[in-house]
Design a protein with these regions (language model features):
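A metal-dependent hydrolase metal-coordination microenvironment
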Residues: 1-29, 78-92, 97, 113, ...
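Divalent metal-coordination and catalytic microenvironments
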Residues: 41, 75, 102, 175-176, ...
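Extended substrate/RNA-proximal surfaces in nucleic-acid metabolism proteins
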Residues: 1-73
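Histidine/acidic-residue-rich catalytic or RNA/ligand-binding cores of hydrolases
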Residues: 51-59, 107-120
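Short acidic/histidine-rich active-site segments
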Residues: 95-111
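Cys/His-rich short segments
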Residues: 134-206
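Short, amphipathic C-terminal "tail helix"
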Residues: 255-282
Length: 282
């Protein structure tokens, strides 16, 4: 099926070997090709600017996919969004939310991930979970605080800075330019159709996590030391006690990891392709 899909898509793509593709066909046509080869179409990083559906194409997926919209079981939220922002759009109430990481480098794998209930590890079971069939489901979404994402707030391309102010920000408060990269937070404020977040009862919890590489003062050697002792970043971020971490890397780092777990870190929002950052409390 993958070879067949690649062969058919090569008719619409200039270089089929590139990692990020531009296909010369509509999304309305694409979903039929995907399903022809037993695939499922799921919009990825659905709100980011430049190339995503909600970020740069439409305010409603149903306008693009029309009667085929019900065949899309899920969307992937992206680093700069979360469940609470996405659930301000009513057409997403019946869609599963996924928090998938990119895989450009080993440290970035699973900086966002999903906890999934399945009977065994297979694509068939995964699809059942995404479609909420036979008791399979997404149990929890683990993702960055969206402020840490590269496109959370609107960015002025002239001044080279995030633009402060209440969302939606649509022009620079310094130079008055509209040469901006719209932030996900600001874009959702424009396209939402709910006055507040209202999630369906079966929506799984969204758990914020601050990857170790974002924590101030935590360098590669200390991260490697933590991983040597505790095996996975998930253990360190979500499961280990303060005392366990303190014994390996000291009170200061242990305190910050606990603060990240409890959502008590101060974060400077990202924008314009630059990650947000954690502000160390003095």
């Amino acid at each position: 099926d993958m070879k067949g899909f690649s062969n058919e898509m090569s008719k619409h793509i200039k270089n089929i070997t590139l990692s990020s593709q531009r296909a010369d066909l509509s999304a309305y046509e694409l979903i039929d090709i995907v399903e022809k080869y037993n695939g499922v179409l799921i919009p990825a990083h659905a709100f980011t600017p430049h190339k995503s559906f909600y970020g740069n194409c439409t305010s409603r997926l149903e306008r693009i996919f029309k009667e085929k919209y019900s065949r899309i079981p899920a969307i992937e939220l992206g680093l700069s969004s979360d469940t609470f922002l996405a659930d301000e759009i009513s057409e997403l109430e019946n869609k599963t939310f996924l928090t998938n990481s990119d895989a450009h480098s080993l440290p970035k794998i699973a900086r966002e991930y999903n906890k999934i209930l399945v009977e065994n590890i297979s694509f068939k079971e995964l699809l059942k979970a995404i479609k909420k069939e036979d008791g399979r489901k997404i149990l929890c979404n683990y993702g960055l605080d969206p402020k840490l994402g590269k496109y959370h707030r609107t960015y002025c391309e002239v001044c080279g800075k995030n633009i402060p102010g209440d969302a939606p920000v649509t022009k620079c408060d310094t130079c008055d330019s509209r040469n901006i990269t719209m932030g996900v937070f600001d874009r959702i404020e424009i396209i939402k159709d709910k006055s507040k977040t209202m999630s369906p009862k079966d929506r799984p919890p969204y758990v914020y996590q601050v990857p170790l590489t974002f924590i101030p003062g935590l360098g590669k050697k200390t991260i490697d030391k933590l991983l040597d002792h505790f095996e996975t970043e998930m253990n360190i971020l979500h499961r280990l006690s303060f005392d366990d971490i303190d014994a390996v890397c000291g009170e200061k780092i242990a305190t910050m990891i606990m603060q990240s777990r409890e959502g008590k870190m101060e974060i400077q929002a990202g924008g314009g392709g630059v990650y947000g950052k954690v502000i160390e409390k003095k």
